[in-house]
UniProtKB/Swiss-Prot annotation:
Active site, renumbered: D107, D288
EC number: 3.4.23.-
Occurrences of domain Peptidase A1 (ranges): 89-391
Name of the molecule in the record: Syncephapepsin
């Protein structure tokens, strides 16, 4: 489900504090940052994709760090590549036997593992060739995903081995594209790896990669830690399955309850402040690594924009001052603690003499807490409880 908003959303532009046990990582193979010259910042498209993505499941309108190959310790670390202005983050994942490298956007807002293949005659990227994998098994169920900008993809299901940070999942359900819109061909990624709950999988009854990491005893804890870097600080990012990396945590982790009744990592934001000024009371939000922006409902977005003197562009985006010294931090209160979005992230991109804000609005009645927030705050996602733990992040 995330694919719709997350993967492409990113393409678009697109209670109690608890100290947690230390989870360390081991030095491994470095990954280089990759830039895609075809990408263009487009906040409007990010908003459209987000709306379409979530409408499917609700009735309401590198510099990468290091890889850890340590299955014995029950954790696996996957480095991420940061594309352009933090538009999206992807990892290179191994699929099949022998392994084929697939670039996937990791998305906590969806639950499908989707990518292009040689079965698709219209795909710009034919990343996976099933005829070259000895462990590939065709299942043949149909799937289809569409997006708010009119783009779409569809295909069939199969199973194969998938490796994440040295952790090899056997018999993982994969969705192979047999058709996709032309807009996919210029993207940096080959598909999406959904990290949401299996209740929102496009193909009913499908186990997600996290489900299989748990059931196949590949990770010691049903958690994964997420650090997303900033281009201004060298880019990159990292997912740690089965643990988290304290090297990217600045302070203590705060536990926040999760409502997963709709398949997402839903949280309650109990307050919203610009500087010391309160601009909104309690509202619901979804922690979504696959969405570029911080997207509010329209009423909340209007209040935030007014506090910053931002102009509504009429398409879900705002024009904001390019002078960071005039922008106070935006604080979201969760679990009794404030978590901040600093001035440098309140400006998403400069277009000519104007700047587009890192926040926007949609017609939905909940917020999508995307990368504008997540690249400033480390999150440990716990599928087992469910809950999340959040702390300020550091590069």
């Amino acid at each position: 489900m995330k694919f719709s908003l997350a993967l492409l959303a990113t393409v678009a532009l697109a209670t109690i504090s608890q100290a947690a046990p230390v989870e360390k990582q081991v030095a491994g193979k470095p990954f280089q940052l990759v830039k895609n010259p075809h990408y263009q910042a487009n906040a409007t498209r990010a908003i459209f994709r987000a709306e379409k993505k979530y409408a499917r499941h609700t009735a309401i309108p590198e510099q990468g760090k290091t890889i850890v190959k340590s299955a014995a310790s029950g954790t696996g670390s996957v480095p991420m590549t940061d594309v352009d202005y933090d538009v999206e983050y992807y990892a290179t994942v191994s699929v099949g036997t022998p392994a084929q490298s697939i670039k996937l956007d990791f998305d906590t807002g969806s639950s499908d593992l989707w990518f292009s293949s040689t079965l698709c005659t219209s795909c710009g990227s034919k990343s996976f060739d099933p005829t070259k994998s000895s462990t590939y098994k065709k299942v043949g169920k149909s799937w289809q995903i569409s997006y708010g900008d009119g783009s779409s993809a569809s295909g069939i299901t199969a199973t194969d081995n998938v490796e994440l940070g040295g952790l090899k999942i056997t018999g993982q359900t994969i969705e192979l594209a047999t058709r996709e819109s032309s807009s996919f061909s210029s993207g940096a990624i080959d598909g999406i790896l959904g990290l949401g709950f299996d209740t929102i999988s496009t193909v009913a009854g499908t186990k997600t990669p996290v489900d299989n990491l748990i059931s196949q005893n590949l990770i010691s804890k049903p958690i994964f830690g997420v650090w997303l870097g900033k281009q201004s600080e060298g880019g990159g990012g990292e997912y740690v399955f089965g643990g988290y990396n304290t090297d990217h945590i600045d302070g203590s982790l705060t536990t926040v309850k999760v409502d997963n009744s709709q398949g997402w990592y839903g949280v309650t934001v109990s307050g919203l402040k610009v500087g010391s000024k309160s601009v909104a009371s309690s509202f619901d939000g979804i922690l979504d690594t696959g969405t570029t922006l911080l997207i509010f409902d329209q009423a909340t977005g209007s209040k935030v924009a007014a506090a910053y003197g931002a102009k509504d562009n009429g398409d879900g985006t705002y024009t904001i001052s390019c002078d960071q010294s005039k922008l106070q931090p935006l604080a979201l209160t969760m679990g009794g603690k404030d978590f901040f979005v600093p001035a440098d992230s309140l400006i998403y991109v400069k277009q000519g003499s104007q700047c587009i804000a890192g926040f926007g609005y949609s017609s939905m009645d909940f917020a999508i807490i995307g990368d504008t927030f997540l690249k400033n705050n480390y999150v440990v996602f716990n599928q087992g409880v469910p809950e999340v733990q959040i702390a300020p992040s550091k590069a």
